[in-house]
């Protein structure tokens, strides 16, 4: 039975390519040789942006600051439990938010995937903090790609592309996330025996099937 599950998982992952990263949200796992300090050992979520490029944030760089420490005079910020995360090198002084909601939380929010939006505008983020503060994760800065730029980075082998998953976006403990996903991707590549298309998109369903102890708990 396990062998059958593995074969089915491999068929699933071999049917998909990194070209899908152009059309929907994905997780990006930095290659070990990616030495840029901004992205070394990072996991990102990225999705198409209205300008034809892509936009996203780094998921595994928590800071030591709380939202309340950044906005001490803003009482609703004290309700936010999680730390503020470092989202990327674009607009480092700006606050953005990944918001878990079944509809757009306000003006200018970019849909990332089902029930997930990236909010940029201050009035939208204020509304989220005041109404559903712990249904979001807050970041200083973000990552942006020009049209075609992300595909170029994937083709150069800078990223392993995996299915986006809300359980990673809002995972409480992000320490070890990069190593976990990297090891899982290597295990899948080993199972595929060199028959995968290049570049390969690895589906989390296949990762879970091949890795019994793979953790995605929040």
Annotate the PLM regions:
Residues 11-20:
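Hydrophobic h-region of N-terminal signal peptides that target proteins for export
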